[in-house]
């Protein structure tokens, strides 16, 4: 029996194979994308930035009378430009802490986000109702060096308004609290201790750079103490009670 070669049939088979191959790749890509969306579905929390940033920018630009925040203790705190290092590390501290929990533990990420977003929202409301600022920044620096240059840069970018309570202080406390309650990080005491030291230095930096009054720091500490039980203590009591019931 003689078989006839049909070039059109061969071409059709090849096209079917190519189509099946491409379809398989597309299906795998879609499946992987769905898996990533499901895995990182808590990314919706980041949409809070669309609320916070426009509101904060409005507060920074609006023309109004600001109540000056000042404490007698501020006059005894010297200007120390070297604290610009921990002050700037705040941005790294928050970013790394947030990213760590985002990619490793959804529950801890939600608690960190709840703590930060609650305090930042209260901050926005306070500054909207009670416009505030300070007049603590030095007119001239006692020394000229790379650190004072960095401070000068921060002064030019950040207005001395909307300072009560201090978000630098509050968010540092939030990051430290999240790290302290992390089960995985409890195995790495060096990381925890290092974060506590950095957090404390960041808090100190706000007053030594004259970016905040001691009043702003106290207000941030008070706000953290009020929100902490709702985010951490209450939740952990519920979890402990549930585990006891299961036993």
Positions of the model-derived regions?
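Short, positively charged and aromatic/hydrophobic N-terminal segments
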Residues: 5, 17-23
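N-terminal transmembrane-helix/juxtamembrane module of multi-pass inner/ER membrane proteins
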Residues: 22-94, 142
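Aromatic-anchored segments of alpha-helical transmembrane domains
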Residues: 53-55, 120-128, 197-207
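Membrane-interface loops
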Residues: 60-73, 102-186, 238-247
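Membrane-embedded alpha-helical segments of multi-pass membrane proteins
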Residues: 86-93, 167-171, 218-222
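Hydrophobic, membrane-inserted alpha-helices
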Residues: 93-97, 173-178, 198-205
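Interfacial helix-loop-helix junctions of multi-pass membrane proteins
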Residues: 140-141, 159-164, 201-227
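C-terminal membrane module of polytopic membrane proteins
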Residues: 213, 219-247
């Amino acid at each position: 029996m003689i078989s006839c070669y049909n070039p059109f049939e061969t071409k059709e088979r090849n096209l079917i194979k190519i189509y099946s191959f491409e379809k398989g790749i597309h299906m795998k890509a879609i499946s992987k994308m769905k898996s990533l969306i499901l895995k990182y579905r808590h990314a919706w929390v980041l949409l809070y930035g669309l609320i916070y940033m426009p509101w904060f920018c409005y507060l920074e630009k609006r023309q109004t009378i600001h109540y000056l925040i000042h404490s007698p203790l501020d006059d005894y705190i010297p200007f120390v430009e070297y604290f610009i290092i921990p002050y700037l590390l705040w941005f790294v501290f928050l970013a790394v802490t947030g990213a760590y929990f985002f990619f490793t533990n959804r529950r801890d990420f939600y608690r960190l986000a709840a703590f930060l977003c609650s305090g930042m929202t209260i901050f926005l409301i306070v500054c909207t109702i009670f416009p505030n600022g300070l007049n603590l920044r030095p007119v001239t620096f006692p020394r000229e060096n790379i650190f004072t240059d960095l401070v000068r840069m921060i002064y030019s970018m950040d207005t001395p308004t909307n300072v009560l309570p201090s978000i630098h202080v509050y968010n540092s406390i939030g990051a430290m609290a999240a790290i302290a309650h992390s089960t995985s990080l409890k195995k790495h005491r060096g990381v925890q201790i290092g974060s506590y030291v950095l957090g404390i230095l960041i808090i100190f930096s706000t007053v030594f750079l004259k970016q905040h009054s001691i009043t702003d720091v106290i207000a941030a500490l008070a706000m953290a103490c009020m929100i902490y039980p709702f985010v951490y203590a209450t939740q952990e009591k519920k979890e402990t009670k549930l585990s006891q019931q299961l036993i």
